[in-house]
Amino acid sequence: MKPRKIILMGLRRSGKSSIQKVVFYKMPPNETLFLESTSKLTQDHISSFIDFSVWDFPGQVDVFDAAFDFESIFTQVGALIFVIDAQDDYLDALARLHVTVARVVTINPNICIEVFIHKVDGLSDEFKIDTQRDIQQRTQDELADIGLENVPISFHLTSIFDHSIFEAFSRVIQKLIPQLPTLENLLNIFCSNSLVEKAYLFDVLSKIYVATDSSPVDVQSYEICSDFIDVILDIGSIYGRSSQLKPGHSPEILDETSSVIRLSNDLVLFLREMNQYLALICIVRADNFEKSGLIEYNVQCLQTAIQSIFSPRT
């Protein structure tokens, strides 16, 4: 699969660099307070199960300036993520967003435009909803005035201090995976035949879920599965083989890694590696997990199918 280009944009201090460091470099959120504001265009290649080229544009830089080759930059972009600080006056940010969207869609009409309404951790639930509604309505009205009412834009409430940023990035990444419908169908079949309540395919580096079955995503189940990955990687770093992790490169799950945790609510978490970067995490009722042999057989079938999907065609 060829690398996907993702562009992060937004005004200064909107939180773009913090998002990138937390999601792809496992930086603790509290440490992002000491990050300096981005002063120049940075490009990071994130090497994992799915390769990404993430471009972080400084907030003070005008990408439409003659110094930038605007067309060549945006022609091959899979997704544009525009970050808005929800705790600040966002009218200037919206003005920049509207201009950016109007220019970008003329160059790349298939680009995925995602708006992260960021830093919502300090806001009440009611204020979050009101802020999202206001930003969404202003954007739709402004674009409609210039004849772009049909441009699809997705809005996400995000914070680096909880799992919402990973959930939002998961939604973005899934739009860039052409095999997503096939993966979802495989997971649906697996869950049905294995009596599994919920199944996720996680990218280990970023804790982004590449795909899940068609049942509704419950925030609590996603959070506990995401935390499960941290536990496995932490234990692996202590008792597994020693390796120095390069920035932007995924920690590898050891071959044939599997783990089971029984929860107090009569549920079982089951993890199984699909390859060195991708892990399957399932939520199973304890009674159904007694048929672990059946589940293991179906996992092997699923693993074979996934590997065949992404294997190079000759």
Swiss-Prot record:
GTP binds at S17, S18, S37, H118, D121. The keyword Hydrolase applies. One of its GO terms (cellular component) is cytosol. Keywords: Cytoplasm, GTP-binding, Hydrolase, Membrane, Nucleotide-binding, Nucleus, Vacuole. Its main location: membrane. Its EC number is 3.6.5.-. InterPro entries: Gtr1_RagA, P-loop_NTPase, RagC/D. One of its GO terms (molecular function) is GTP binding. This is GTP-binding protein gtr2. It comes from Schizosaccharomyces pombe (strain 972 / ATCC 24843) (Fission yeast).
